[in-house]
Amino acid sequence: MQTLIVTPNEAGQRLDKLLAKYMNQAGKGFLYKMMRKKNITLNGKKCDGSERLGEGDEIRLFLADETIAKFTGGGAAKPTSGYYPKPDIIYEDSHILVVNKPAGLLSQKAREDDTSLNEAILNYLIDSGHMPVEQLRTFRPSICNRLDRNTSGLVVAGRSLAGLQVMNAVFKDRSIHKYYQCIVKGRLKEKQLIAGFLRKDETTNTVDIYPLEVENSVPIMTEYLPLAWGGGFTLLQVTLITGRSHQIRAHLASIGHPILGDFKYGDRSVNEEMKKRYGLRAQLLHSWKLVMPEDLAAPLDYLAGR
């Protein structure tokens, strides 16, 4: 027999959904049969799987240990093998982490053998004792926003289910304010809001910018503020009004001011010179500030406006 106590990260979902995650090698038919026969109970009573779980609810599995081991895969595994350095944590509480992603590291895996920030965060939470590895069966912390591999800066991850849901919502509705800094070729003197249309080519993973709408394009808006100038380059603060793939890089390049070190949209001769002279291997684009919306929902309302 085994007893499961519903945690805050598991509350709110249906019983059958939780059981399917926990005993992920068992078929749905088996789980429903065990509930009908009262081999699986909820708070000491017969259940059918449709019950909405609350924190502290007690699920009992009147099954042999061998059966449980068979249908749970024998034990929860850590998300990755190998060595992951501790993430550069800027802020952490019980609901979220804010991490400084280095250039060159994927935000999330594209292939099974990839190394990514998401796995580094999971390993940190487990190794630090913040999250038991067994919890990965029913809840998996995850990042809420992604940066390009060669863009550095702030990435938010949800540590709790509530934190993950709230942060996913504000990134989706764009109510969180995102600020970047970058160094571009040429001189820009004044604050500007630029607009256009972006179309992505999925086969080449590149985007094109157009002044007018074209087929399969989406509208974009980017605001920049010059902070410093020297040596033929300008340091900009960039605010994303919309947030599209490669938007900052391609939009600035389209007005003749590509980001230094951007080998996809930038000036290749300038980049090669900077690589030769300074060892520059990634674009000088950094996500440096995030500001939460004033109406940030509970339980993260203590971060509203911060």
Stretches with model-predicted labels:
Residues 43, 108, 158, 210, ...:
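Thr-Gly-centered strand-to-loop micro-motif
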Residues 1-33, 65, 82-87, 206-208, ...:
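Pseudouridine synthases involved in rRNA/tRNA modification
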Residues 1-202, 215, 229, 299:
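RNA pseudouridine synthases
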